[in-house]
């Protein structure tokens, strides 16, 4: 079975992860809404699931600065603005509840694909939870 790091704001606040480098291959973010910091962790994951996160969190944190190695982004959250769907991820799977954003902002982007809402959750079922794999702390800026 595949493994993923599940992070939920209720149990692990975003600020606790500041200056950390996480090496988990797959990360699931749930219900985050922090936008009061430009500093955060760096995730070296290849697969990222974003579920029920605030649109401002998605705008400020779901990018190559914090997720430089992501190939597949599964987005079950409001993308907030066109720039989110234009970011340089190999594939962005946007759940159908937000499909109007693809039609409005990214209709010509072949890497943005609409998936049924239930497929997002079926995909998650393939992953067993794993612990945080830390590399090191960042130097302070």
From Swiss-Prot:
Pfam families: DUF5845. Belongs to the mimivirus L163/R849 family. This is Uncharacterized protein R849. It comes from Acanthamoeba polyphaga mimivirus (APMV).
């Amino acid at each position: 079975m595949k493994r993923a790091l599940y992070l939920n704001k209720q149990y692990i606040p975003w600020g606790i992860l500041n200056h950390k480098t996480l090496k988990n291959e797959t990360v699931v973010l749930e219900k985050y809404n922090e936008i009061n910091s430009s500093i955060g962790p760096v995730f070296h994951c290849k697969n990222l699931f974003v579920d029920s996160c605030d649109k401002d969190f998605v705008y400020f944190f779901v990018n190559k600065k914090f997720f430089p190695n992501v190939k597949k982004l599964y987005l079950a959250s409001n993308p907030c603005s066109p720039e989110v769907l234009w970011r340089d991820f190999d594939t962005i799977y946007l759940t159908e509840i937000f499909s109007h954003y693809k039609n409005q902002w990214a209709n010509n982007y072949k890497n943005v694909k609409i998936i049924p809402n239930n497929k997002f959750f079926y995909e998650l079922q393939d992953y067993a939870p794993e612990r945080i794999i830390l590399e090191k702390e960042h130097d302070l800026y």
